[in-house]
Amino acid sequence: SNAAFLALPDRERALVRRVVATVLRRLGTLRHLIGLLLDRGAPPDAPRIETILLTGTAQILWLEVPDHAAVDLSVRLAQADRRAARYAGLVNAVLRRVAQARAMAFADDTARDTPEWLLKRWTKNYGADVARAIAQANGHEPALDLTVKEDAPRWAERVHGRVLPTGTVRTLAHGAISLLPGFTEGAWWVQDAAASIPARLFGDVRGLRVADLCAAPGGKTAQLAAAGAHVTAVDTGFGQIAHKL
């Protein structure tokens, strides 16, 4: 349940997010591989088994979870479900085979993880090579972009990132954002590099009065305020702005 998820410690909640995101990002490959290893398909009378196999396989193949830990957790999840308990042995066997068949998962899987209609559109607009490159890029967890109040090089070093030409700090750090240095003191906020450019185009705004219309969730408002502007932020979603500030 959502309440149970929110009650998890930060690190565990971050892992859950990564597992779910990885399953969605690699769903085609996961289902293909599991299908190859299941002689008769997933048990129709225990729908949760497919979910358990998907999350377990994702942990084994793409996350930094030891094979034995992913298998053990998946088996225990099956045992805890009334309808899935009888298939705990199946879960154990399939996931052990997954751990031994990693190469199968990485064999030309780009098309499997991309909706056919989308791949066709990309191919039509950009050509087959570029379409394939886009699909491959979509298979990777994106970088995290941060806008910092000041001293971008210092914060880039602290979060193990780099400063982009736009001034954004980009890092490949994964896990709970709240655990990164600078989060508690509000030294930075998450904002895509492209989203930060419009406010930077104003140049020196120190002492100027700026109206930020349609301001939620507040990233550009925070940028302008940090740069010394007197900002009036307006939006129907005021709660989102207040949360950001």
Residue ranges and their predicted role:
Residues 1-245:
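S-adenosylmethionine
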